Design a protein with these regions (language model features):
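Acidic helix-start/capping segments at beta-turn-to-alpha-helix junctions
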Residues: 41-47, 120, 127, 151
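Conserved, well-structured interaction surfaces
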Residues: 61-140, 175-179, 191-203
Length: 205
């Protein structure tokens, strides 16, 4: 379909970076909205889903009326269910998008970049830091009074970087939470702060 796929020569740095916030609010981001799954709308849906797991949202328990009751009642969230993949599928697609921007810009010396390149690269690092921060908070097992999982204590999620090969991605175990912070989140935020220090958002008004 020529309206759904961009050719390589149509993809620019601008379209790559602008595609990230657009994808965060995409209806049908997992492909289930067309099958009647009303919870399939990217980051806003993830926010509602996680909020439904707290005590601040009243859950009716009938998924025929409340599309987020599955998160509130902790049902059908395993690996065999589409709802369980809402966060995983979306976040790693967004991480890939950020990695694609980072891969396109030579980040070895920020001083050689023009203002546009600095802003695009800064956005990509900031987005990627946010995505990994969210994933770590979602998937890190915390000690509690109800379940035990000593085998995954201290583990977060797999780290995928621009240089990660397909073969490496297929055998990419969960990284330690500390490593995700030290190798990705904190460095990405430091780079974003440096790259965006001179950035001023345009005034639409």
């Amino acid at each position: 379909d020529p309206y759904e796929i961009a050719t390589e020569d149509q993809v620019t740095l601008e379209t790559l970076i602008e595609g990230i916030p657009a994808s965060l609010v995409q209806a049908g981001s997992e492909g289930y909205a067309s099958e009647g799954q009303a919870w399939d709308f990217a980051l806003p849906a993830i926010h509602i889903a996680t909020e439904s797991m707290t005590g601040d949202v009243a859950i009716g328990g009938n998924i025929g009326y409340d599309w987020f009751a599955q998160w509130g009642t902790n049902e059908a969230l395993g690996a065999d269910y589409a709802v369980g993949a809402l966060t995983w599928d979306n976040y790693y697609a967004w991480i890939m998008a950020a990695n694609n921007v980072i891969k396109q810009i030579d980040a070895s010396d920020f001083a050689t970049l023009d203002a546009t390149q600095k802003s695009y690269l800064g956005f990509a690092y900031a987005y990627r830091a946010m995505f990994y921060l969210d994933l770590v908070r979602l998937y890190e097992f915390k000690e509690n009074n109800y379940t035990e999982a000593p085998g995954v204590l201290g583990l977060g999620v797999p780290i995928v970087l621009p240089e990660t090969t397909e073969a490496e991605a297929k055998n990419n175990p969960r990284a330690k939470v500390d490593d995700i912070y030290d190798q990705v989140i904190f460095p990405d935020l430091d780079k974003a702060e440096e790259l965006l220090s001179g950035f001023t958002a345009p005034d639409k008004y």
